[in-house]
């Protein structure tokens, strides 16, 4: 019996492949558990259309992420912070504070996506921002004392 695999099946194949499976295996395990569908022309056509739609959504999402990356990399955050007695910052700058400053520039990023150590001294820093799908942006931060 020919089946279209919906999920990867160990020993049979990967999702999207059309495979020959024994009738009992297909009827009693693969199809009821949602691992496969009977490979009719309509099912194959529907699967291909769904894959095209997913691919288009992914392209659109990647384009939006690349646009966001360019926007982040074009911004330099200037953060003014109180200084302690020894010239160090009074309190550290965290990813939460960086996310709040990005909001002021119209960029909303979850603080969990900003990969940085706490900044405790005045100076220039480059911070990695993870946007998803393997896309990373470099954010420049300039910390100044008050």
UniProtKB/Swiss-Prot annotation:
Transmembrane segments: none annotated. PROSITE patterns: RIBOSOMAL_L9 (PS00651). Keywords: Ribonucleoprotein, Ribosomal protein, RNA-binding, rRNA-binding. One of its GO terms (molecular function) is rRNA binding. It holds the Pfam family Ribosomal_L9_C. InterPro entries: Ribosomal_bL9, Ribosomal_bL9/RNase_H1_N, Ribosomal_bL9_bac/chp, Ribosomal_bL9_C, Ribosomal_bL9_C_sf, Ribosomal_bL9_N, Ribosomal_bL9_N_sf. Belongs to the bacterial ribosomal protein bL9 family. Binds to the 23S rRNA. This is Large ribosomal subunit protein bL9. It comes from Nautilia profundicola (strain ATCC BAA-1463 / DSM 18972 / AmH). The gene is rplI.
């Amino acid at each position: 019996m020919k089946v279209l695999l919906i999920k990867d099946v160990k020993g049979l194949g990967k999702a999207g492949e059309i495979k020959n499976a024994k009738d009992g295996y297909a009827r009693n395990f693969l199809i009821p558990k949602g691992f496969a569908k009977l490979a009719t022309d309509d099912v194959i056509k529907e699967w291909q259309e769904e894959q095209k739609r997913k691919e288009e959504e992914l392209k659109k999402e990647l384009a939006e992420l690349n646009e966001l990356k360019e926007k982040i990399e074009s911004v330099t955050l200037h953060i003014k912070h109180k200084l302690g007695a020894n010239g160090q910052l009074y309190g550290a700058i965290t990813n939460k504070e960086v996310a709040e400053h990005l909001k002021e520039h119209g960029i909303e990023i979850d603080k969990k996506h900003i990969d940085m150590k706490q900044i405790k001294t005045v100076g220039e820093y480059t911070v990695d921002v993870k946007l998803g799908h393997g896309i990373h942006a470099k954010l420049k931060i300039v910390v100044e004392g008050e």
